[in-house]
Amino acid sequence: MNALAATSRNFKQAAKLLGLDSKLEKSLLIPFREIKVECTIPKDDGTLASYVGFRVQHDNARGPMKGGIRYHHEVDPDEVNALAQLMTWKTAVANIPYGGAKGGIGCSPGDLSISELERLTRVFTQKIHDLIGIHTDVPAPDMGTNSQTMAWILDEYSKFHGYSPAVVTGKPVDLGGSLGRDAATGRGVLFATEALLAEHGKGIAGQRFVIQGFGNVGSWAAQLISEAGGKVIAISDVTGAVKNSNGLDIAKLMKHSSENRGIKGFDGGDAIDPRSLLTEECDVLIPAALGGVINKDNANEIKAKYIIEAANHPTDPEADEILSKKGVLILPDILANSGGVTVSYFEWVQNIQGFMWDEEKVNNELKTYMTRGFRDVKEMCRSHHCDLRMGAFTLGVNRVARATVLRGWEA
């Protein structure tokens, strides 16, 4: 089942639990606007190249639409639509005043020079600048994009609308970015994991963790979990996987990964088959890479007691059912990885106020939001007798539905 089908299925189950009117249910599912633009740029060699860009603006009942822009060769309308919808529910679960959006350009950023990436970003911004804005739609980095990409968007947008630092988040700090933003998603994973474990009388210390993915989210999660006393025993990235039953030295692994462009060859553990990583014996499994990695083919072999979804849509619905029967608790992506968009909200607030927070305030506020989000999800679980995923979806959908009705938008 692809991401769009799975997200829509979860929404429909939540709508049924909430008893939503069928017309309201339909209106919440259909995107507010879908944008498709052609972006032609001159390459460094003088030839012209054309790319297709997308922006799906799903819902704005609770505030400006919010979501990343990704550069990847497999970007397609269905994926962007699914991720935009997911952002609507995610921002509602986090209880930040946003709706959901997502964007992307079908390209391979590794095959483009910095100059070509800049030209592509500026052309894309020119095509959508009148459809985004501080109080309309606020983009952010995603796969294949970063703070520099946001700086280019900010600059190009400002040519049309005047200097507007709040039009994007995830910017460099020198252009109004927030302290703590780089670590935000990984730190949010830590706080969410702490909340889940505390519910069962446990803490981070002494728990054995396996993490799939060692990019921004996975590496920060590993570092912060290790600092909190957790034992990270296995990690993988695109180059390979490494295991040390006594716990990996995360600081050394990060240094090795930076110097060698991956964890392959790290001498602080044993190399293992990346395909076996998800089924390693552990207490907590954190998929922090691609979607759909936990499926009906490997769900029965998973030995973790808890799964924290740091990636978007890492668990297929079929696997969900298998793991539920095994008693595995899954903290869903729309709660577990909401730290990034939460600190993006803090950045937006700081830009509008013209007042910068220190990093301690950012981190303290993030912990408050993540802990409260978990508590709110648990309350929905008790009210509707459902698991954590459906508790999160019912919470998010209910908040958006209430805002829609209050604004008089129901069909």
UniProtKB/Swiss-Prot annotation:
Instruction: Identify the domain of life.
Output: Eukaryota
Its UniProt entry gives the catalysed reaction(s) as:
L-glutamate + NAD(+) + H2O = 2-oxoglutarate + NH4(+) + NADH + H(+); L-glutamate + NADP(+) + H2O = 2-oxoglutarate + NH4(+) + NADPH + H(+)
Q: Record's PROSITE patterns?
A: GLFV_DEHYDROGENASE
Induction remarks: Slightly induced by NH(4)Cl, NaNO(3) and NH(4)NO(3). Induced in roots after nitrogen (N-deprivation) deprivation.
Q: Where is the active site?
A: 102
Expression by tissue, per the entry, reads: Expressed in roots. Expressed ubiquitously in various tissues.
Key word Oxidoreductase present: yes
Q: What family does the Swiss-Prot or TrEMBL record give for this protein?
A: Belongs to the Glu/Leu/Phe/Val dehydrogenases family.
**What's the protein name?**
Glutamate dehydrogenase 1, mitochondrial
Organism source for this protein? Oryza sativa subsp. japonica (Rice)
